[in-house]
Amino acid sequence: MTITPLHRRRFFQMMAVAAAAPGLSALTGAPDARVLGRVLAMSDLHSAYERAGQLLAALEAEIAGSDVPHLIAVDGDIFEHGNVVSVRSGGVIDWAFLGELPKLAPTVVNLGNHDNDLTPDLHEVVARMRALGIVVVSNIIDARDGRPYAEAAVTLPWGERSLRVVGAGTNSLNTYPKASRDWLSIPAPGDWAQANLARLLDGADLMLVMSHAGVAGDRDILPLLPDGALMIGGHNHLLFQHEQGRSAYAHTGSWSNAYTTATLYADGRIAVETTAVDLAAAPSPRLAGLIATTLATHLTDGEKAVLGASPRALSLGETGRAVAAAMARAAGVEAGFIGHTTLGTGLPAGDVTRYAFDAVVRFDGKLMTAEVTPERLAGFMARANQDRPMSLAERSGDFLYGSRSGLDGQATARLVTTDWCAMNQAEYFGTTDLVFSEAPELRVKTVAAEGLMAA
């Protein structure tokens, strides 16, 4: 499988990295090989209503007039409890979006950790998806009675061939809605794959593995992946591609900022490319009116109030580093770090309302400080900012956006992070011995808003 640069229009400046080559790349098949089908994959949509209509329009354009079989693959986290409009409306826009997908092409959803944000019982979520004509896959089990919430594998007719689709979720229970955690039994991804993947893929023609386990879990699945399979990852809000023999592994971005197209060829090769979803593009008429009406109905004056203005749009990574720098300034320390999924999307240009800002900084919390040596701080910085090109082996899954200033020969350095990252320091900092103390009267959202925007 060769790797070639994408055309400029495919370049996704917001978050793009490709593990296999500098810049954003495509894993490409031979241009003269017969196309068997195309998978349009996306994950971690999180009720991103500012781009939902544009994403649907892009999918419509991809499929319109094509005689090639298509499959739409949604790899979890469709809903977002932090979106007040989603909560108040019962996710009416999300459900309408989902309902349009099977009208375009066969659609498969693999359950993520936010898909029961609005409806705690996943059985109800799965039943509603199936009523729309969506196929659901998952390895999550109902801990109350041992029933699976969905089949772990399905075989779908796909043009002249068939496609076996396998689904796996993240076993990080603390990322699921609290009300549902006692109802969920989720195996460790690697252990589950070791025990089940070969059986589930036995006799398969074409193969698609959808994992919402995140990079750390996927790393245990990949060695078990049959050559020539396509694997789509999610959960970490990353955008990258990786080749393994004739297999392709891709993370597709988040917040409806992008989708990934995987083209399967008759010679066994797979071409993978990423397309940005333009915020300024025309939304699909099938969704545009509903989005406008729903926002007008459910947003309060306070949520429509302008917090400040941004002179330019920032990518997600730029936003993360700007927030980290603002946290460091507010706490009077040398370095700031914020968890990657504390953020949703990049800061837009122009006036930013409270509602729009809440999509940028999803969660509030305390700021926590710790003291480290300059050498340890350098190590944390090397681990941070994984929106850059880097190999799969270097990726940690959960990561931090970080910003630091000079130390001027200091023997110690101080850092600040959120209470979530302090509590989960093993995942984010790669250590368990940092001693944190609270930075009094500082909150994540207040500091971020003041640092990002000029009032």
Language-model features: where?
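Sec-dependent signal peptide hydrophobic core
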Residues: 15-19
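Catalytic centers of hydrolytic enzymes
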Residues: 36, 42, 47, 256-330, ...
